[in-house]
Each structure stands twice: as C-alpha cells, then as structure tokens.
Amino acid sequence: MCCRRVFRLSHRKEGMESARQTKRVRVYVSGRVQGVFFRDSTRERAERLGVSGWVRNLPDGRVEAVFEGEAGAVDELVRWCHEGPPHARVEGVEVEEEPASGGARGFEVR
C-alpha cells in the first residue's frame, strides 16, 4: 500500500514537471488577421498566460508570432490563435517548434 501511494505521487509530479517544461514556437496565422486587433489581443492573452515573446504583421497579410513559456500555456495560446479576437477570421495556423532560449521576458507587439 505504501509503495502504491508513492508511485501515484511520483507519477503526478512527473506530469506536473512536463507541463512546466519551457516550450518555444513560431506561429504564422493567415486569414483576416490584420486590422482586427489580433496583435494587441495576442499580447493581452500572452501576458495573462505568462507567455513571453512577440507578435508582428507581415507584408503578405499574415501575422507572425513567437511564444515561449510553460508548455501548457504556450499550447493554450496556440489554440487561441485558431480563433483569434472577435473580428478576426482565421483561415490557417502554422506552428514551428524552436529550441527554447530560456531568456525571453515580457511580450512585445512589433
């Protein structure tokens, strides 16, 4: 009985540690994503989730962003990008994983 309880605690601890792993992704969002407060909304959401990075408009009409933080928070922000703010019409989201730098602090609209 003692060993079983220890196993459960260590299993939960491992799950918590993997959720806390630092993750970094580069995201490209296409559709009607410029002129609809996508960048400001992304910054607000990132700050709420504790995700660092930046977001900018691209000349081809897409939005590019880099997110770095706890894996679960980064994943949640990427999921949000599939919908975006109320006036956006997201048609596609491309996600590229990158090595985490560990030095990212704050979130910037470029």
UniProtKB/Swiss-Prot annotation:
Q: Which reaction does it catalyse?
A: an acyl phosphate + H2O = a carboxylate + phosphate + H(+)
UniProt keyword Hydrolase, yes or no: yes
Domain Acylphosphatase-like residues, every copy:
24-110
Q: Name one GO molecular function term.
A: acylphosphatase activity
Q: What InterPro entries does the database record attribute to this sequence?
A: Acylphosphatase, Acylphosphatase-like_dom, Acylphosphatase-like_dom_sf, Acylphosphatase_CS
Source organism superkingdom: Bacteria
Q: Which Gene3D superfamilies match?
A: 3.30.70.100
Instruction: Give the E.C. number(s).
Output: 3.6.1.7
Name of the protein = Acylphosphatase
What positions constitute the catalytic site? R39, N57
To which protein family does this belong?
A: Belongs to the acylphosphatase family.
